[in-house]
Amino acid sequence: SGELERRLESDQKDELLAKVRRISHMANIHFVWQTELNGLGDAVSHGRTFVGSDPFALLLGDTILRQTDSSKPVLQQMTEVHEEKKASVVALEEVDREKVSRYGIAGGTQIQHDILALDQLVEKPLPEEAPSNLAIAARYIFQPEIFEHLSRTPRGKNHEIQLTDAMAAMLSDHEMYGFRFSGRRYD
């Protein structure tokens, strides 16, 4: 971001500044700041004018995913699923059943070794109400239709607009897939 570059420049951290600038030319990265904390769904909705009618990747910056059984990064593998299925894709990780109430949880049918056709998404369910122990893992590739669903999503848990609720609504008229990655999540 421009803010980071200005800070590095003023601190005379030229080598780090050069790396940041090189990275910024590799992809079209856009940061959106919420004026009020109204949930992840609200934050994503602020990106609508930037995204337009294109599919887009959403990476939550407070989480790192490290793939252990492939030389390909998680997002690259998700992109391959998206290109094949022409549908939204979300990263999934197995969590202990007693921890499902901390995450958005997905349910669906396994169609390949690491791919599920999703039919259920629930934000922070009680363990006995969870459709599985597959947690949404901070990486998404969305079709632009998510924005219509976000605009109609009422406030949910903690009186916030929950991305998981909009995704669940999207399942009624769009396919969505889960990519089950093998590795570690650092949150």
Go through each PLM region and give its residues.
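Structural beta-sheet core signal
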Residues: L58, V90-A91, G178
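Short, conserved catalytic or adaptor-binding loops enriched in Gly and charged residues
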Residues: L17-A27, V81, T109-I115, A169-L171
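A short acidic, often aromatic-flanked loop/helix-cap motif at beta-alpha or helix-coil junctions
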Residues: E36-L40, R97-E98, P127-E129, R185-D187
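Terminal amphipathic alpha-helical/low-complexity segments used for targeting or macromolecular assembly
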Residues: E3-S10, N28, G52, E83-K85, ...
